[in-house]
Amino acid sequence: MSTATNPLDLDVCAREPIHIPGLIQPYGVLLVIDPADGRIVQASTTAADLLGVPMAALLGMPYTQVLTLPEAQPFAVDDQPQHLMHAEVRFPQRATPPASAWVAAWHLYPQQWLVEMEPRDARLLDVTLREAMPLLRSVERDPGIAEAAVRVAKGLRSLIGFDRVMIYRFDEEWNGDIIAEARKPELEAYLGLHYPASDIPAQARALYLRNRVRQIADVGYQPSPIQPTVHPQLGTPVDLSDVSLRSVSPVHLEYLANMGVTATLVASIVVNDALWGLISCHHYSPHFTNHAMRDVTDAVARTLAGRIGALQAVARARLESVLLTVREKLITDFNDAEHMTVELLDDMAPDLMDVVDADGVAIFHGNDISRHGTTPDVAALRRIRDHIESEHHEALREDAVGALHVDAIGEVFPELADLAPLAAGFIFVPLMPQSRSALLWTRREQIQQIKWAGNPQLAKLEDIPNSRLSPRKSFDLWQQTVRGRARRWSPLHLESARSLRVLIELMERKRFQQDFTLLEASLSRLRDGVAIIERGTANAAHRLLFVNTAFADVCGSDVAELIGRELQTLYASDAPRANVELLQDALRNGRAAYVTLPLQVSDGAPVYRQFHLEPLPSPSGVTAHWLLQLRDPE
């Protein structure tokens, strides 16, 4: 452990192995059983008192000697883990039964069985799933996520009696905010507060996704160690990921104590297999929640998650319908046009903005730029394109249907941070790289006022000299003004932009193929040798797109062998450098060239020919193809 006093990197907390603490909470008992012979190989120190057997004698005993189950013994059907719900259990070795009935839950794995036991606590059994049914039915009818969240917070608090119940929602960066709250009137309100991602690190979120309901009955508990600390056969600490009794990280316990919280109950809100948020319940005195009440909480969380998923699906379907209508209109306009031109895209500008819900759109054709809606000026737009092409062009070209997007321009391109007021967010879609045609959608900056529960910049764990990791202690309201960010582009809007790119490219290819077929038919009948050269890209050289028979004869090759070959393979490698550079310069700048080079004939020594290169007309005004003729030198 470092003794520096500087804030640690958050990875320090994220690396804490919270799934193998070697400890459980002391209100219960854990046994680890070898499925091969049913013998107990590990146990928590609380087991001896409950089972009436000293620890030394307990280890190695068949579990059937210390547990009496009302149902058939558990068994593993296959290699997949099984989790058996709580059922009453008795202890035949005890001289007198415990004061309260106990229940056991089984976690069956191929190499070990885990049995966790806890008191039933009959005083709490008046809260069952039956009492929760009116709440569940109402949540299923709520018209929005906000309404459902408020209903759950109020309804669950009335059912399980916690001092405070909150609905906690994660954002894309795993920061959280309280969107609904029910609390005792004398408690400070947390509604609307935000919490940094470091408060719930990645490995904790992974456990929330796996183990849906967790409680801490008293943050001041003294944990019960598991003995021995390492499994005798497996040689590893026991994995408690699925165990409700798992002891909590000391860092988290101190975090709760710093908030003044004594007991918690947390249920995961999982939507489409992703952790959407949490139902977080706080109590300010010790508070044990038995398995029946936890089952009620789990049912409420799952119902809320189902409603959130359904409402999100409806919203997505509505948005998809709107975007589909816009795309269909664009398809009709494309089909009615002879070619994809700047004027055509300019006429479509309102629909182009609607298709991704943008504030503005810029249309690039070579060095020409047209603007619509709210965008930066032309000079600023050129700066954006130049940065994209210089830093991200490789990724864009590798993704055939890619769309580069940002929500905070200054975070990706610090040199462009000054453009945030009008272009904090953008989507860049290249259409025809060889002609530098592209669409750039923009969104304006949205200034946000965020209320944090404590300064998020001070939320990192601190390494205390000669001590241990310590969480933050301040949760005082801290307001932050967030600038430089736009509304986030939703997956649907990004998908819509990609679909539009594919549509435009397909339309252009269709038009080109029609024109090329006519040109090919005409060129094939010529007696002179001619070829069509296609402009290359940063990742591909200029290539032969078409050759007629006469051209192939001059090269001493077949037509099929020549099509697709790189232009540079036509002339010898020792060709005069100055002439090669003249040819390449013409190709780069879309100009004509007349250069004498040694033609590499397949069946003999190079023969000097004059390469006549003429650019073919292009609707975009940027040369993408050339007509090549090979002539005798003058």
Swiss-Prot record:
Recorded superkingdom: Bacteria
The protein's assembly and partners: Forms head-to-head homodimers.
UniProt: biliverdin IXalpha binding residues: 13
The organism of origin for this protein: Xanthomonas campestris pv. campestris (strain 8004)
A molecular function GO annotation: photoreceptor activity
Region described as Tongue domain: spans on this chain: 452-480
Family affiliation: In the N-terminal section; belongs to the phytochrome family.
Record's keyword annotation contains Isomerase: no
Gene3D superfamilies xrefs: 3.30.450.270, 3.30.450.40, PAS domain
Record's note on what induces expression: Expressed in dark and light (at protein level). Part of the bphO-bphP operon.
The protein's name: Bacteriophytochrome
Effect of residue 13 to S: Loss of photo-inducible Pr-Pfr conversion; protein still binds pigment. No difference in growth in host, increased callose deposits, increased xanthan production, increased sliding and swimming mobility
Record note on disruption phenotype: No growth phenotype in liquid culture, slightly better growth on plates, strain loses slight sensitivity to white light. In planta is more virulent, with increased growth in host (A.thaliana) leaves, mutant opens leaf stomata better than wild-type, has decreased leaf callose deposits, produces more xanthan than wild-type and is insensitive to white light, has considerably increased sliding and slightly increased swimming mobility, generates mature biofilm in the light and dark.
Keywords: Chromophore, Photoreceptor protein, Receptor, Sensory transduction, Virulence
Pfam family, one: GAF
Chain segments carrying region Photosensory core domain: 13-514
Region (Phytochrome-specific (PHY)): 325-508
GO biological process: detection of visible light; regulation of DNA-templated transcription
UniProt-listed NCBIfam families: bacphytchrmBphP
Post-translational modification: Contains one covalently linked biliverdin IX-alpha chromophore; present in the crystal structure as a mixture of Pr and Meta-R configurations.
Note: X.campestris pv. campestris colonizes plant leaves and is responsible for black rot in cruciferous plants (Brassicaceae). In the cruciferous model host organism A.thaliana, morning and midday infections result in more hypersensitive responses than evening or night infections, suggesting light plays a role in virulence.
Domain PAS: 13-118, 515-590
Domains (record comment): Composed of 4 domains; in the N-terminus the PAS2-GAF-PHY domains form the photosensor while the C-terminal PAS9 domain is the output module. Long linker helices serve as connectors within the GAF-PHY and PHY-PAS9 domain pairs, forming a helical spine where the dimer interface is assembled. Thus both the photosensor and PAS9 domains are required for dimerization.
Residue ranges annotated for the GAF domain, each copy included: 151-305
